[in-house]
């Protein structure tokens, strides 16, 4: 059968966040490439829920990596600021951003020569329409 229907579905929140950040910061979705540049942000969806068929609420982790702790912290704070601005301007599917927790990991577990700061944020996004 080739019946076409229009559905409402979740957005790819990792990509939405990356797109919101790309003009201002170097941002990657999982997996982090082997040759990543710093400072950068790694975006990982770690949970979420559906609210009344209109919006999704996503739990997202932002991991900032840089050559020193001050730059990692600055990169993380800038990323959160850019996402809040995107939500306020409504230039993406992102409608609201709230920080649940943030802090320093000390050194990056993958590359101990780098410092790492992380935040777990909650992102509210509109559903998208798709024909299938």
Residue ranges and their predicted role:
Residues 27-31:
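Short, well-structured beta-strand/strand-turn elements
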Residues 32-36:
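A short beta-turn/loop motif at secondary-structure boundaries
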Residues 37-45:
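A short, hydrophobic beta-strand-centered structural micro-motif
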């Amino acid at each position: 059968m080739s019946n076409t229907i229009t559905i409402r579905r979740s957005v790819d929140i990792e990509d939405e966040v990356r797109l919101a950040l790309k003009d201002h910061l170097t941002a990657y979705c999982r997996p982090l490439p082997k040759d990543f540049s710093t400072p950068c942000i790694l975006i990982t969806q770690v949970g979420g829920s559906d609210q009344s068929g209109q919006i999704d609420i996503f739990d997202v982790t932002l991991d900032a990596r840089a050559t020193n702790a001050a730059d990692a912290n600055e990169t993380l704070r800038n990323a959160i600021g850019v996402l809040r601005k995107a939500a306020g301007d409504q230039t993406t599917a992102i409608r609201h951003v709230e920080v649940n927790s943030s802090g320093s990991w000390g050194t990056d577990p993958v590359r101990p020569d780098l410092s790492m700061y992380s935040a777990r944020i909650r992102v509210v996004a509109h559903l998208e329409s798709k024909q299938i």
